[in-house]
Amino acid sequence: IPVVNKRITVSPIGTVCAGYSRDQMVKVCKLLDDCATDAGVDFLGGFGALVEKGITPGERNLIDALPEALATTNHVCSSINVGRTRTGINMDAVKLMGHRVLDVAAATADRDGLGCCKLVVFCNIPEDVPFMAGGYLGVGEADAVISVGVSGPGVVKKAIDRAVRRRGEQVSITEIAEII
């Protein structure tokens, strides 16, 4: 199965950089982007916050930094968790993220709103997410963890290629659906 994207995640930056200003959060995002480039990975996740029960000043600064941060970086992805079944939905966070999603889209309009492809707003985010764009290293994880994920598109492509080799070019759409 081909490796489609190489990804790394960090602990939620809203927690790690809790005392940072908006401008400092943008600088952190750019630093993370440089690290992703140096590491040779396609995506770096973790520029995010867990705000389901309230928003700290640092988390608010991170959220306010999202438009500039995602518009000026290539590899960094962000996830914001706004609710949990047990604790409810932080409606202030939902409202704030509604505005920030629009701001990110506007900030990356020259690239077809690409920033929004690097931003996920969750409810019930898992404790650790290795998949982009919502990836982050869970706070209960060890300092170095390897998660191996199977790429859905890579698996599908490999299965279709195998069927075409076996049956020739005459693979029907029904057969492809069955393979998938």
Feature locations, PLM:
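Anaerobic metallocofactor- and corrinoid-dependent redox/one-carbon enzyme cores
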Residues: 1-180
